[in-house]
């Protein structure tokens, strides 16, 4: 298989001058895949793949009805075995293409670094240079750095269709491709590397890309941990080093004049994997405990490996080197306290002080692992000998002791290498790896509180209370010095309470930082937050200490998801911040109010315009409120991978937030396929972290200087656009008869639910086919599969057209908004990507799946009309003659995939017809289930996203 090259514009041709190497590698990998298909699947399958590939390439060049009929007739003749092999061929081609593009992008960045000139927009060097030009001094930069918190949060939402086995093979192909590209190889070594790539492609072909069984929560936890082992443990120190080097270069004169700087540890990670129980009955207190223990074992294993490696580096011998007095005293103490470390060989490293110290540290970490092994073997920690590290602070003290000794004795350059990297790791990951968030739906807490109150005779009908009475009752309970003992609750409610008790215990046994936020989904009112605090109070997470002072070891993060909930943010948060006891608890937990904003459900609810604008306004309201009350604020952005779920480049997304609302802190979800694309390789992970952090720096200018506010007129225009766009979207999705039938019949939403790509059900309620029941992930995933991508653009065309009505003055204002307002620019940029990924010709074919052909055609025409209107209006406003003109490389990447996606979409349509055909027996229908599910994975790989 070789790569398709579409007809190119002049701009694209210039862009492709630097794209030659990419095309060569795509062609090379495609050729190897073709060889493997021929060898493993046989000539017939190879010829079939080639016929389809070339046929659909020709169809893209010339929309020939006779050729399309011929190709579709040919598809209908293929048996299920051949279809399965054909689908796999295209799916693996997409995986290889994605890997080649990732390697190519990394290679280009390395060329820029080696050339020593200007780097890519969003690099540390580019960002700091612009900040300095804008007047940010090194002192101000230090102030900004001291306020930063950058926290990606990994989730296990069922959108990652790629198996970990395949990711490991693709990682090896990435590294081999790097050897061919960057390293000068002898002809022999080059041939050997090419053979090794072919071997990996053979393994790829021989490894099933579709999971045979649905993953358990434990599987999902391990999948999340995979990215730390494969990339993040190396990428995090690298990104800190990159920032330090850029600061030294940009602020060289200040540093040479004697001004110093420190880059504090501001990168933190969070996770929902094993903690998110909203709608997932398989996440229990036991699985949450297992997640924490797996996290701890993963990170301590890494520390053990790195300490072992350091012992082969810090080999200084006495009397050839000097050590600090503190180091000498520590070694003497360790000889007594940890004598067992040297029991087998007392004189080990006797004259090598750093190696002897590191060996003691290695012994202590080994004891930590032994304790954990007891948990995984017997369900309880092994007996503690007293040698294990109690917490990360003890390990950091030992590492800093070595660091300071090296620096004091002239070895700062040695201290600043591998040892410094390990210190960064411990500062970042502690003994807990990442902060595990707990998420639960609000009604579960209300039910539990109601039973607690009834069982303790505090109140017998909590559900009948008004919101104000609930707040008063709950505040009263929180203010009591003592609460009554609890009886055993009913099953589900006892499980809710067990989670709070588990948090109390593991904060004590593992780390006070083991848990992040307690996220309440579907937060509608202030009592929902107070309910969680009362449950936390019952479990000992907050309350009064022996001195009578308030303490709180729980941070509650209300999640506002729907358009209506976003509009209620101000009264809900005001009620909380005006509650004196809540404020005292908030102060005790760090005086930080975190608020989570749901992109996915708000977009599904009211469309992309209503979602984006209501989220923008919500952030302004939260920022204003918390500032008035003297409370720090952090927004937690619940973004998905696709545009319809808040996706898009992280750097641009951060910059598009309302001016002055970021304030140095940002937390956001990284979901599904985003994880493998961003963190599957060290090199890309370091780049993605850097791009996000540089965006955070730029957006945090308000910490040290006034920032330009949005023109009030722009806000008013956006309000009008949103009103029209939301009305258009709701008219289609809620008021148009037959729309949901169209969705379920045209999109593979039911079939997606059959895929083994996540432990959580695809619907909130089984059998409920309403728009509110289908999860936002399934909603977006399904529209993407059928090439509608509807949630990411519907209503924008109508909104733009109805506002400007071809008035040139109004058009000029919209164009000025694109140039001056990052939010509006990012909105239309993301819309262009969604429009590019849509294909109305193919979507029309999916529309033919409707049982009522006339109704299906009518519905499609409504959607297609808005698509073309949106296409025309967006291009008009951004002043371009085609989509994504500002990002030609990305545009070409998407176009390069089109003729390979086309046959998979047509195969999927054919298989949906066969699988849903109730006129044949179940056995006949089941024949097509496996190849059908494979088309879903293949299209996901080709479009580079799922939900």
Regions found by a protein language model. Give the residues of each.
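Often metal-dependent polyanion-binding catalytic scaffolds in large enzymes
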Residues: 1-474, 492, 647, 733-736, ...
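Hydrophobic cores of alpha-helical transmembrane segments in multi-pass integral membrane proteins
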Residues: 34, 619-629, 864, 868-874, ...
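Carbohydrate-active enzymes and regulators
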Residues: 36, 51, 65, 100-102, ...
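Structured alpha-helical segments in the cores of large, soluble enzyme domains
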Residues: 130, 163-175, 189-208, 388, ...
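Beta-sheet entry/capping signal
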Residues: 264-266, 270-272, 280, 423-424, ...
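Catalytic or ion-translocation cores adjacent to nucleophile or general acid/base/metal-coordination motifs
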Residues: 283-315, 539-727
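Active-site cores of enzymes that catalyze phosphoryl transfer or operate on phosphate-rich substrates
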Residues: 363, 367, 371, 434-436, ...
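Long, compositionally biased intrinsically disordered regions
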Residues: 699, 706-947
């Amino acid at each position: 298989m070789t790569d398709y090259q579409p007809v190119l514009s002049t701009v694209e041709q210039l862009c492709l001058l630097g794209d030659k190497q990419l095309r060569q590698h795509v062609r090379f990998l495609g050729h190897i895949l073709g060889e493997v298909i021929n060898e493993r699947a046989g000539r017939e399958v190879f010829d079939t793949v080639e016929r389809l590939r070339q046929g659909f390439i020709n169809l893209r060049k010339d929309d020939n009805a006779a050729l399309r009929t011929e190709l579709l007739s040919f598809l209908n003749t293929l048996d299920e075995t051949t279809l399965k092999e054909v689908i796999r061929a295209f799916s693996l081609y997409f995986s290889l293409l994605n890997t080649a593009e990732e390697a190519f992008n990394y290679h280009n960045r390395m060329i820029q670094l080696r050339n020593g000139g200007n780097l890519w927009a969003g690099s540390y060097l580019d960002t700091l240079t612009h900040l300095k030009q804008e007047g940010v001094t090194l002192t101000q930069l230090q102030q900004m750095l001291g306020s930063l918190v950058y926290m990606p949060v990994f989730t296990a939402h069922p959108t990652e269709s790629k198996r970990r086995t395949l990711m490991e093979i693709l990682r090896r192909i990435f590294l081999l491709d790097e050897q061919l590209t960057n390293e000068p190889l002898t002809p022999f070594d080059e041939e050997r590397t090419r053979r090794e790539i072919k071997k990996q492609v053979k393994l790829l072909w021989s490894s099933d890309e579709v999971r045979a069984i649905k993953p358990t929560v434990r599987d999902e936890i391990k999948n999340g941990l995979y990215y730390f082992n494969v990339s993040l443990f190396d990428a995090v120190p690298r990104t800190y080093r990159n920032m330090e080097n850029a600061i030294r270069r940009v602020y060289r004169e200040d540093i040479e004049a004697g001004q110093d700087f420190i880059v504090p540890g501001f990168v933190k990670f969070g996770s929902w994997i094993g903690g998110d129980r909203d709608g997932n009955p398989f996440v229990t207190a036991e699985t949450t405990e297992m997640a924490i223990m797996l996290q701890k074992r993963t990170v301590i294993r890494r520390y053990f490996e790195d300490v072992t490696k350091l012992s082969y580096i810090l080999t200084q011998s006495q009397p050839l080197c000097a050590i600090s007095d503190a180091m000498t005293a520590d070694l003497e103490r360790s000889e007594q306290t940890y004598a067992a470390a040297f029991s087998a060989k007392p004189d080990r490293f006797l004259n090598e002080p750093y190696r002897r110290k590191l060996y003691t540290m290695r012994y202590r970490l080994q004891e930590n692992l032994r304790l954990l092994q007891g948990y995984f073997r017997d369900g309880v920690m092994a007996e503690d000998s007293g040698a294990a590290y109690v917490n990360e602070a003890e390990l950091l003290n030992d590492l800093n002791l070595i660091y300071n000794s090296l620096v004091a004795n002239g070895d700062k350059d040695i201290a600043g290498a591998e040892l410094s990297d390990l210190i960064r790791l411990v500062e970042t990951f502690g003994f807990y790896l990442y902060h595990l968030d707990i998420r639960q739906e609000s009604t579960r807490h209300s039910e539990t509180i109601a039973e607690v109150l009834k069982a303790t005779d505090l109140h017998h009908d909590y559900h009948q209370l008004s919101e104000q009475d609930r707040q008063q009752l709950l505040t009263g309970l929180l203010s009591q010095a003592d609460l009554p003992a609890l009886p055993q609750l009913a099953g589900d409610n006892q499980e809710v309470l067990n989670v709070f008790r588990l948090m109390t215990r593991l904060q004590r046994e593992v780390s006070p930082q083991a848990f992040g936020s307690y996220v309440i989904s579907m937060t509608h009112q202030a009592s929902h937050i107070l309910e969680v605090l009362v449950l936390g109070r019952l479990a000992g997470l907050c309350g009064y200490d022996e001195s009578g002072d308030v303490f709180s070891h729980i941070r509650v993060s209300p999640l506002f998801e729907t358009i209506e909930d976003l509009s209620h943010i101000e009264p809900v948060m005001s009620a909380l911040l005006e509650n004196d006891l809540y404020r005292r608890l908030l102060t005790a937990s760090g005086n930080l109010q975190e608020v989570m904003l749901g992109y996915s459900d708000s977009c599904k609810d009211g469309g992309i315009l209503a979602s984006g604008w209501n989220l923008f306004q919500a952030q302004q309201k939260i920022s204003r409120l918390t500032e008035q009350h003297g409370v720090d604020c952090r927004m937690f952005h619940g973004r998905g991978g696709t545009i319809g779920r808040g996706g898009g480049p992280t750097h641009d997304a951060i910059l598009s937030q309302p001016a002055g609302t970021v304030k140095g802190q940002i937390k956001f979800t990284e979901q599904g396929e985003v994880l493998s694309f961003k963190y599957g390789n060290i090199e890309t992970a370091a780049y993605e972290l850097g791009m996000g952090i540089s965006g955070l720096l730029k957006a945090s200018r308000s910490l040290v200087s006034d920032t330009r506010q949005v023109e009030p007129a722009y806000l008013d225009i956006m309000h009008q656009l949103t009103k029209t766009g939301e009305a258009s979207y709701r008219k289609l999705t809620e008021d148009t008869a037959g729309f949901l039938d169209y969705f379920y019949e045209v999109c593979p939403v039911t079939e997606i639910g059959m895929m083994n790509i996540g432990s959580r059900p695809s619907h909130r309620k089984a059998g409920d086919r309403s728009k509110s029941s289908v999860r936002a992930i399934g909603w977006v995933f399904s529209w993407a599969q059928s090439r509608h991508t509807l949630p990411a653009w519907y209503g924008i065309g109508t909104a733009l057209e109805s506002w400007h009505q071809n008035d040139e003055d109004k058009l000029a204002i919209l164009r000025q908004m694109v140039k001056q307002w990052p939010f509006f620019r990012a909105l239309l940029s993301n819309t262009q990507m969604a429009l590019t990924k849509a294909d109305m010709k193919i979507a029309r074919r999916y529309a033919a799946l409707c049982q009522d052909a006339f109704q299906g055609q009518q519905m499609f025409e409504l959607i297609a009309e808005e698509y073309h209107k949106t296409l025309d209006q967006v291009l008009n406003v951004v002043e371009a003659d085609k989509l994504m003109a500002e990002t030609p490389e990305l545009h070409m990447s998407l176009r390069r995939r089109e003729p390979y996606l086309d046959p998979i979409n047509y195969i999927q349509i054919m298989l949906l017809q066969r699988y849903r055909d109730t006129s044949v027996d179940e056995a006949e229908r089941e024949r097509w289930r496996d190849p059908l599910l494979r088309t879903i994975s293949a299209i996901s790989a080709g479009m580079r996203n799922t939900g």
